[in-house]
Amino acid sequence: MLYSRESRTTVLFLALVTSLTVLCHSVDVTTVFTTSTITEITTVTAAPQPQNKAETALNTATNIIQTMQFLFNCAPFKWKGPLKITSCALNFIVLLLTAWGYLLKYLQENKLNSDADMEKMVGLGFGEMVGRIFGKGVGKAFTKMDITQKLVYPFEGSNRQKCLLMTVGENSIVPFHDLFTEICFDQYTLDSLSHHNHGSISILDAGSVSALGFADISSKMPSVSELYTLFGDYTIEVLGGITKLASTLNREDWQGERNGFAVLSRDRPNQTLLSVHMYSSSLL
């Protein structure tokens, strides 16, 4: 069975092996201290350190493995209390945004710049898409999430906005069935978001972990570090939005509302770099 100890060990081992081939992520050092809320984070940035490819690959493998562990821990019969539920919802949203970010990064690195290229990747399905980016062993595990995807174009134009719609199916191990996630962006989004101020988020203190709602995650927070790889100096805004959405999904009436957040450009206040919304099919 999927949730047996042997199955989990096998999947995590496959994730480690396949993820060790990923050598493209930067490893810098920044320490982040927080007080009680996410908006009060102060970043102390260290000078850039020489990239160590072996360390980079190991860090990436660790982050992927931890995300996979959350999938197992969030199975409905393992939920224990509202904090646990909030943590599962939060990690689910982190997973979707991380997968989306790595999709754009994969397309850029392989010079697949057309809408058709993106549609082809999205058409593979969530698990197969993840497998194409990180390796088949990882993708097979993520297939159990039973997520379907499609691209839509709400506005016409040469640089038109795109929205990735991700739908959780009835057979998903994530208990948010009939949930639609809408991630809207344009072709410049990743470049705009991923600006780095010479470092990466690597450490959060225990108090900040509780403030973010990560009730059962190590204070080192590799998932947050992975988000910083994609969202750079906008990570704080993204985390704030993720926390808001996680709290919404923790309410029994979440199906009756359309909730989300937008990340605005700091250079062009009227420009939306990224928007994320979650809602039930009943609101379509």
Swiss-Prot record:
Record membrane topology: Single-pass membrane protein
Cytoplasmic side: 25-84
Subcellular location: Cell membrane
Record's keyword annotation contains Transmembrane: yes
Keyword Membrane assigned: yes
GO terms under cellular component: plasma membrane
Residues carrying sugar: N270
Record-annotated membrane-spanning stretches: 85-104
Extracellular side: 105-284
Keyword tags: Cell membrane, Glycoprotein, Membrane, Signal, Transmembrane, Transmembrane helix
Signal sequence bounds: 1-24
Remaining remarks: Present with 396 molecules/cell in log phase SD medium.
Similarity field: To yeast YNL019c.
Protein name: Uncharacterized membrane protein YNL033W
Species annotation: Saccharomyces cerevisiae (strain ATCC 204508 / S288c)
